[in-house]
Amino acid sequence: MAVYNYDVVVLGSGPAGEGAAMNAAKAGRKVAVVDNRPLVGGNCTHLGTIPSKALRHSVRQIMQFNTNPMFRQIGEPRWFSFPDVLKSAEKVIAKQVTSRTGYYARNRIDTYFGTASFADEQTVEVVCLNGVVEKLVAKQIVIATGSRPYRPADVDFRHPRIYDSDTILSLGHTPRRLIIYGAGVIGCEYASIFSGLGVLVDLIDNRDQLLSFLDSEISDALSYHLRNNNVLIRHNEEYERIEGVENGVVLHLKSGKKIKADALLWCNGRTGNTDQLGLENIGIAVNSRGQIQVDEHYRTEVSNIYAAGDVIGWPSLASAAADQGRSAAGSIVENGSWRFVDDVPTGIYTIPEISSIGKTERELTQAKVPYEVGKAFFKGMARAQISVEPVGMLKILFHRETLEVLGVHCFGYQASEIVHIGQAIMNQKGEANSIKYFINTTFNYPTMAEAYRVAAFDGLNRLF
């Protein structure tokens, strides 16, 4: 068994692992990264964010072709199979792997591919994919192993018609009807994707409102557009059992309902990838979902071991994970790059997409904050009309007296891009955070960003 010494060893090469490794390497530390796949990128690149967003992009293009009257001069609506659409995602994955492999090489970061486990607080043993065992000794270690779909013991995921959000990418046919159990972010995104391919989707929600952490108006808009695309949303339902049959799946609900479909996609929760790390050897405990508790510096119970990304739970976003990993390494190298990551915009890639940052109306009302609302509807925006993207709106919440921007909520075309302008203003200190910025700033025309100016005028006109 060969022994290699490093300053920092990072377990996982997803967004959190990459962020930690790059920051430590640029600070002059000798760094190694371990991943259990034969390629870098983590779950985000291979099974999560990248393939699902690439799928969504392809489906949006199909939907635009099939609904835009101009294209009727070319031909009738076209329908594509799920495997056909998946091919475009596979091309993006390959490009991402090539790019990220280059990042590690340029920064002289050693990569190991295999299963890592702790021998002690400074030693990690790696069983490489070729069977060779390597021992990595480091002063500091960052756990960034990510998460995987939660699989309850009473659901038979070996059945060929029962999938989770990882295995759905191996779906070799296009089901006529699909049950999606779990109406969180992933469930809603896949409901949009499959309904866009003409699949009849039953979306099972354990709660009484979709994505209740969103502003209520945005959540209601999402519900409307999913239903408008033939997604049947069933609220306040829980499964009794899931029965795999020869030609599909039967979902038995506690309410007494039975639903049959060609396949079932399980999207109800995630579990931290910690069960094979040997954490019991170093005294680190995990919660019931396999997640590790950390302090504000992303340090675990063991002083030289840090954790970041999905493996620590909230907010479980690739964007936040990258910053958490970078901040964890910043705590290690003390180069001033540490910050506690809590100001994170929400990006939900449904069709249409959603993005928000800051407080919702519900939160401000409960806190008795005197706020006002400014709105811009995309159907009136020149750029949206040109792009034939009339669905959506931008909503700004601001303080009636100080004019401070308190929240930005966007639904529709380019929402995840638009939100960052509001985020930049909200991050300004004192009087610099003001809705008047949007009034006193000249925006390019026609653009979607111009919605801020329209919404600001709308909101200020409500004051008296």
From Swiss-Prot:
Query: Which molecular-function annotations from GO does this UniProt entry contain?
Result: dihydrolipoyl dehydrogenase (NADH) activity; flavin adenine dinucleotide binding; NAD(P)+ transhydrogenase (Si-specific) activity
**Keyword Ribosomal protein found:** no
Per its Swiss-Prot or TrEMBL entry, what cofactor is needed? Answer: FAD
What is the main EC category here?
A: oxidoreductase
Per the annotation, how and in what number is the cofactor bound? Answer: Binds 1 FAD per subunit.
Q: What UniProt keywords apply to this chain's record, in alphabetical order?
A: Cytoplasm, FAD, Flavoprotein, NAD, NADP, Oxidoreductase
Provide the E.C. number(s) assigned to this enzyme.
1.6.1.1
SUPFAM superfamilies xrefs: FAD/NAD(P)-binding domain, FAD/NAD-linked reductases, dimerisation (C-terminal) domain
Catalytic activity as recorded in UniProt: NAD(+) + NADPH = NADH + NADP(+)
Pfam families reported for this sequence: Pyr_redox_2, Pyr_redox_dim
GO terms in the biological process aspect are: 2-oxoglutarate metabolic process; NADP metabolic process
Give an example GO cellular component term for this record: cytosol
Residues bound to FAD: D35, N36, R37, P38, L39, V40, G41, G42, N43, C44
What's the superkingdom here?
A: Bacteria
The record's subcellular locations are: Cytoplasm
According to its UniProt entry, the function of this protein is described as:
Conversion of NADPH, generated by peripheral catabolic pathways, to NADH, which can enter the respiratory chain for energy generation.
Give the family per the record.
Belongs to the class-I pyridine nucleotide-disulfide oxidoreductase family.
Recorded protein name is Soluble pyridine nucleotide transhydrogenase
